[in-house]
């Protein structure tokens, strides 16, 4: 399963949201993510992809779409 597919599956499991058609939509503005959801997502991303997401790098504007989240995971895997 690709990173993109896994991230989409995480959103479905954690938030019961199908974000597959919302790849570039702001997930905060759409009501999919909030502060608590962000923490849940970070924990799941770290566990699923065996990465460490520095809170200082998890800016709302940098991780607000599925596409940006996938790119962030890819960058952290290659860091």
UniProtKB/Swiss-Prot annotation:
Pfam families named in the record: PP-binding (PF00550)
InterPro entries given in the database record: ACP-like_sf (IPR036736), DltC (IPR003230), PP-bd_ACP (IPR009081)
GO cellular component terms attached to this protein's record: cytoplasm
Location(s), subcellular: Cytoplasm
Known pathway: Cell wall biogenesis; lipoteichoic acid biosynthesis
Protein modification: 4'-phosphopantetheine is transferred from CoA to a specific serine of apo-DCP.
Family the entry assigns: Belongs to the DltC family.
Protein name per the record: D-alanyl carrier protein
Species classification: Bacteria, Bacillati, Bacillota, Bacilli, Lactobacillales
The gene coding this protein: dltC
